């Protein structure tokens, strides 16, 4: 076991703070409509220009091990917010930085960190409840376009493109983002389907940047039950290899031997393949697998129809022009099913809906019909250079996640104003002790930070604008940093998804609470250059 270096108390918190400060300063410059870009060095190729907080955070590694731990803890805020909401990473980082900064001041004054933590939790619960009360449904295409544009760094063309895509495939429809071949981004709608099942092994990933498996001109094996016989599967794999097509396996489950065979073939480059579990449960799973079969022109492997795995041939497989599989979902584009068969299947589902006894069954049948009829919207992102294309694709992806969140939980005024209005509920709130009340005040002060930073990045004076916005009784009144004008932010189209704002706040508070209750740090000790180097630089502890 390698020797360890330990630091405690103020020395540990000082190191954490320096790491947090370094990462936060790099991320904060991207916030708001007038936020700046960051240039990232890459191991290969030209530098990457980004305006995404999570990408900036992921790129930072500090030389000092203890400071780097602080930076990585703050990076976790951005990563978790990105994973859960797809947007709001910079706001979460700014909030966490503000809470940690205020909290460390209180700790330096001798306050109890556990009481501070309880005060933070009480304040966050109160503010979240107020945000949910403030949220309004995202009802119109115009509101969706505004949400998307703001998330895409105030790019109206991206907002309009996403609003158009949602109009065409519905709010639950599948939207896929691809590289375009021209200078202008375009929207296409193709026959396709998306369901919420991802790959069974990360070894299937062949697109590292998007953490997905992409299979072009793919054959699709559909199994109603479990895939348990490796010997029956091998002849089919040989046929698929000869045909030169990738293979997507959709089954109730795949046993370890069969999964291992697919993974090994993928890693060796013998066959591009991927395996996913079939969507749904019980009888609904059977019906959904049959939906996929109709869409792709395949035949389901099922004892009920007398087709076993050993009898399956290439012509029994479904086909699609493209399949994209992530950790959480599978998207099939351009299925080879006959249009009349698809229309007949949709008609059958709608008849079943008329006979359904419960709202839940009707809802699920509506979803199935929508997946078959709505298709998949393809946004082909255009740009002049590869560097611009990557940056623009990231903005489109952020905008898509933001619109999904807005549809799910509604919208609130943007520009940091929603947090400023929600903090009014903290004015009369007190904790059980003085230190708990200080935790509440800590959160109240941190809720100003997103607005302050947006204004600062726009080149204006934060305190002046903060005071004017805070004094207004109108809950939607705020400052539009893009136009440098005051007014009703909802009418001006400066809106944020309530879900993104909520998750940014909750994740920021979670990490801030953990950091404020930390009293010791342990890291692998560097090799000492001499006997005197055996003590750590703080002089707080020898190596163990």
Curated annotation (Swiss-Prot):
Q: Per UniProt, what is one GO molecular function of this protein? A: unfolded protein binding
Q: Which reaction does it catalyse?
A: ATP + H2O + a folded polypeptide = ADP + phosphate + an unfolded polypeptide
- PROSITE patterns named in the record: CHAPERONINS_CPN60
Assigned EC number: 5.6.1.7
Q: Which UniProt keywords apply?
A: ATP-binding, Chaperone, Cytoplasm, Isomerase, Nucleotide-binding
Identify the main location. cytoplasm
| InterPro entries per UniProt | Chaperonin_Cpn60_CS, Cpn60/GroEL, Cpn60/GroEL/TCP-1, GroEL-like_apical_dom_sf, GROEL-like_equatorial_sf, TCP-1-like_intermed_sf
Pull one GO CC term from this UniProt entry. cytoplasm
**Top EC class per UniProt?**
isomerase
Q: Localized where? A: Cytoplasm
| Top-level taxon in the UniProt lineage | Bacteria
What single Pfam family name could you report for this chain, choosing any that match?
Cpn60_TCP1
Which positions does UniProt annotate for ATP binding? Answer: 30-33, 87-91, 415, 480-482, 496
One Gene Ontology BP term is: protein refolding
**What functional role does this protein have?**
Together with its co-chaperonin GroES, plays an essential role in assisting protein folding. The GroEL-GroES system forms a nano-cage that allows encapsulation of the non-native substrate proteins and provides a physical environment optimized to promote and accelerate protein folding.
Oligomeric state and interaction partners are given as: Forms a cylinder of 14 subunits composed of two heptameric rings stacked back-to-back. Interacts with the co-chaperonin GroES.
What family does the entry list?
Belongs to the chaperonin (HSP60) family.
Put simply, this protein is called Chaperonin GroEL 1
Species in which this protein is naturally found? Polaromonas naphthalenivorans (strain CJ2)
Gene expressing this chain: groEL1
């Amino acid at each position: 076991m390698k020797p360890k270096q330990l630091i405690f108390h103020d020395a540990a918190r000082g190191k954490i703070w320096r790491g947090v400060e370094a990462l936060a300063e790099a991320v904060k410059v991207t916030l708001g409509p007038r936020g700046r870009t960051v240039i990232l060095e890459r191991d290969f190729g030209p530098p990457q220009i980004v305006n995404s907080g999570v990408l900036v955070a992921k790129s930072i590694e500090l030389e000092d091990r203890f400071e780097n731990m602080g930076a990585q803890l703050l990076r976790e805020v951005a990563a978790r917010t990105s994973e859960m909401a797809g947007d709001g990473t910079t706001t979460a980082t700014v909030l966490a930085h503000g809470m940690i900064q205020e909290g460390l001041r209180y700790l330096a004054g001798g306050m109890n960190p556990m009481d501070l933590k309880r005060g933070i939790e009480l304040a966050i619960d109160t503010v979240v409840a107020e945000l949910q009360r403030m949220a309004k449904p995202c009802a119109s295409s115009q509101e969706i376009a505004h949400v998307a544009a703001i998330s895409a760094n105030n790019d109206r063309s991206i907002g309009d493109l996403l609003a158009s895509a949602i109009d065409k495939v519905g709010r639950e429809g599948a939207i896929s983002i691809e590289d375009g071949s021209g200078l202008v981004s375009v929207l296409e709608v193709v026959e396709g389907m998306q369901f919420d099942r991802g790959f069974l092994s990360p070894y299937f990933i062949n697109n590292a940047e998007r953490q997905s498996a992409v299979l072009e001109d793919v054959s699709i094996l559909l199994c109603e039950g479990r895939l348990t016989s490796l010997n029956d599967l091998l002849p089919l794999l040989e046929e698929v290899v000869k045909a030169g097509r990738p293979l997507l396996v959709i089954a109730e489950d795949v046993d370890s031997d069969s999964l291992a065979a697919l993974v090994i073939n993928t890693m060796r480059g013998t066959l591009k393949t991927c395996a996913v579990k079939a969507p749904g449960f019980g009888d609904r799973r059977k019906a959904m697998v049959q939906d996929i079969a109709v869409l792709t022109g395949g035949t389901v492997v099922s004892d009920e129809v007398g087709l076993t795995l050993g009898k399956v041939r290439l012509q029994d497989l479904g086909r699609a022009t493209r399949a994209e599989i992530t950790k959480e979902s599978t998207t099939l584009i351009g299925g080879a099913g006959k249009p009349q068969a698809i229309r007949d299947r949709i008609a059958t589902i709608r008849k079943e809906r008329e006979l359904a006894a419960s709202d839940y069954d009707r809802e699920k049948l509506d979803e199935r019909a929508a997946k078959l009829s709505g298709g998949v919207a393809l946004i082909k992102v255009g740009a002049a250079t590869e560097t611009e294309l990557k940056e623009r694709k990231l903005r489109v992806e952020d905008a898509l996640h933001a619109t999904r969140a807005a549809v799910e939980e509604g919208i609130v005024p943007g520009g940091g104003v929603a947090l400023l209005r929600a903090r009014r509920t903290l004015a009369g709130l007190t904790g059980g002790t003085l230190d708990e009340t200080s935790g509440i005040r800590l959160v109240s002060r941190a809720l100003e930070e997103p607005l302050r930073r947006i204004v600062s990045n726009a080149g204006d004076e934060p305190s002046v604008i903060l005071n004017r916005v805070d004094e207004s009784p109108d809950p939607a009144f705020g400052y539009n940093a893009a136009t440098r004008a005051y007014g009703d932010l909802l009418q001006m189209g400066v809106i944020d998804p309530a879900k993104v704002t909520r998750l940014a706040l909750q994740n920021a508070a979670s990490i801030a609470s953990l950091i404020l209750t930390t009293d010791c740090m342990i890291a692998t000790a560097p090799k000492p250059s001499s006997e005197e180097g055996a003590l750590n630089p703080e002089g707080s502890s020898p190596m163990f």
